[in-house]
């Protein structure tokens, strides 16, 4: 057995065999089941991409229609979950509420303890539909608004915007969010996905695995960077400051600029390429170009001065802001997308399971160290 010691953070360590996602960080390549993310962003939908992630192949037209039908039929929440959302304290963040509600969903799943492949797929349909419903419903409840029932004639992205705002979204808004969901749907063995696989490997249930993933995504070193980007942009706008000068001041004060650099990519994050274009076009269409223009000025400066590239979080901030989405919903929307990838990994893990149990390199006091009686301790 190998006794190789990994570096801190397991950087560069291969910890699983997976056929779901491939990344070439040097070349800036991201693919789902071998298909380049650029092709999916240009040609696919979130539903089709999710089907690809779960099954390993692109669906036929009939298979896609069936997949879409199953996902829309899963748009249902037990009234007790809605009561739970209603009872959440005002201090609770949407991410905390989503995590808690998803854990509670297991109470009302008759097959919670069934970890067969078919049961896991069924639960994945339910969770994918329910994530979006929970976020939209909670946002309306906390604002004192009526809950908007799902519209089964709308696709996943459009239905979320409909339930969130109570207004049928434009084709531009729908397609923008649809592409954003595709881009965020999967990213190999990131912290939340690894957490989900570790939990699933113990033969715990799917709800526990994705609840653990949500807990990991809630951490600011994983999810939430786009929230930091947008708070910075709002502050620049509030002060009427020049974006580049503002960022120079942050750097002089040794403050981190959110949305730049990536643990895996050594060149531009391929997801940022699409989000940049979307942010620009959406801003033009909405007559609100300032968020993109501020972001672009900052990106050009950071790239030239610090040799850092924008990551997926940087332009998702201005994209969501132009869609009128509140900042504290950005990470929950990440989860609405990433449940597709989490589910794929849980299914893959349980289809060929082995408990994940690494070792730790001991760096404590030498063995054997003596036990010192209380009266002899200094």
Language-model-detected regions and their locations in the chain:
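Non-transmembrane, aqueous-exposed alpha-helical and coiled segments at domain scale
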Residues: 1-378
